[in-house]
Amino acid sequence: MTLYRTRTYIAADFDHDKDAVDQLHKWNDSKHWSLSFTDAHDLQTSSDDSLPCSIKSSLKYRMDGSKTFVLIVGDHSNSLTKGGCQLCGSYNSHILSCARGRYVDYRSYIKYECDKAVEAGSDIKIIVLYNDIAIDKSKCPLAVRDKGIHAPMVFYKDGIYYWDYQSVKEAFDS
């Protein structure tokens, strides 16, 4: 079955940056904003208690159906380990292999997703949004650090932080 690249894939540290993901969905779902995308995560679901290799297989399927990859970068994005086989109960650290006979991949989910986006090459647009008022590439995974469009999601005015719709919209439109 051929999967057409029509969706937007959103990658983030859902433990720390879910607020930014939720804000993207609010703008997308609102009739008052012109941000519009179809979330690739609607293609296939996987549960949090699945094996990392099963989840990565599902992530790859979603990525293969995406024309845009959006990474939300926060304070922990570049140091995450969740998704690495070394954290799976099926991983045997003595012989460095999977007890289920699956491939061993030490990358976190975010690093895996970034690598897959880069591997897609010109088939996918890469947008890196920072859950902050500034772009800090040291927080960004190496694979996409110098790829695509980078933009802040937040601005600061009169002592208050606000979501920066205009910055995000310009990143999507460029």
Predicted regions and their residues:
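Conserved beta-strand segments of the P-loop GTPase G domain that flank and frequently precede/overlap
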Residues: 11, 71-74, 128-130
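Hydrophobic transmembrane alpha-helix bundles
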Residues: 70-80, 168-172
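Conserved N-terminal substructure of TIR/SEFIR domains
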Residues: 1-69, 172-174
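Amphipathic helical hotspot of TIR/SEFIR-family domains
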Residues: 80-135, 140
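Conserved beta-strand scaffold positions in the cores of enzyme catalytic domains, especially
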Residues: 37, 126-128, 153
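Conserved BB-loop
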Residues: 31-58, 75-91, 95-104
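C-terminal interaction surface of TIR/SEFIR-family domains
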Residues: 2-7, 132-174
